Regions:
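Short pre-active-site segment immediately N-terminal to the catalytic Zn-binding motif
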Residues: 93-108
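Active-site His/Glu-centered metal-binding helix of metallohydrolases
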Residues: 110-118, 155, 159
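Catalytic Zn2+-binding segment of zinc metalloproteases
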Residues: 114-131, 168
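Hydrophobic or amphipathic, alpha-helical segments that drive membrane association/targeting
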Residues: 1-75, 79, 135, 142-143, ...
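An active-site-proximal "capping" alpha-helix that borders the catalytic cofactor pocket
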Residues: 57-62, 150-166
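Residue-level signature of catalytic and energy-coupling elements of molecular machines
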Residues: 37, 58, 93, 112, ...
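Active-site-proximal gating segments in proteases and membrane effectors
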Residues: 64-90, 141-143, 161-229
Length: 229
């Protein structure tokens, strides 16, 4: 006669529950990307910058970075962000951000967002987020998801510097966006390029001081290399 083993039953139930949760979240993610994404996107962007100097800057960066099919649009939410869904690539920046920054700063911001597209960060962040929601009771995955997001932001900073050679422009842009947000000013401080204030393991954005210091260090290193060359 088969003997019931409580521990084995618990393992089977938990395993089945986790698989079911992961399957449901995966399905929801697929449906959202296919049907909800276009509507959400249209609510976050307005007209394009066709024919403007900004559009030319984006095109030049795309050529340098070997990225195709990018549409530069005005952001109606946040200050600057990028989205990639089934090959539809969008970089959006707010008119307020553009008007408050120098051309070099805007170029550095666009390069940062293009770097997310080039590095396929939507996929990396999406996988981390999917795991977090599928295993919602696992605190480690919440830390992992936040860590992945921070790491991809730092990588995008580094990539922006690689293609623009303007680390101080990016540092200045970060400080301007951060200042506008914490002064409760309208426009570019809405918080997608820098993110809300927060430190620690659960913060999805790197510490601002750390980001700026890294960029200053890059500028010093570039200056040293120029002198030695």
């Amino acid at each position: 006669m088969y003997e019931l083993q409580p521990q084995r039953v618990i393992e089977l139930v938990l395993g089945s529950s986790l698989l079911a949760s992961f399957g449901i979240v995966s399905l929801m993610s697929l449906v959202a990307r296919r049907y909800a994404f276009p509507r959400i996107l249209e609510g976050m962007i307005a007209g394009d910058f066709a024919g403007s100097r900004l559009s030319e800057t984006c095109a030049e960066l795309c050529k340098k970075m070997n990225i195709t099919g990018v549409n530069l649009r005005e952001a109606t939410v946040g200050n600057a962000f990028c989205l990639d869904n089934k090959g539809r690539k969008v970089v959006a920046v707010s008119p307020e951000l553009v008007s408050s920054m120098s051309p070099a700063e805007v170029e550095a911001v666009i390069a940062h967002e293009l770097s997310h597209l080039k590095n396929k960060d939507s996929r990396e962040k999406g996988l981390a987020r999917l795991a977090k929601f599928a295993f919602v009771f696992d605190p480690v995955l919440h830390l992992v998801e936040a860590a992945v997001h921070r790491e991809r932001e730092l990588l995008a900073d580094q990539s922006s510097v690689k293609y623009t050679q303007k680390p101080l422009a990016l540092a200045s842009a970060l400080l301007k966006v951060h200042s506008a947000f914490h002064a409760s000013l309208p426009g570019p401080g809405a918080g997608l390029f820098v993110g809300r204030k927060g430190k620690g393991l659960l913060s999805r954005y790197p510490d601002l001081d750390r980001r700026v210091q890294r960029l200053i260090d890059m500028a010093r290193e570039m200056k040293t290399q120029t002198i030695l060359a």
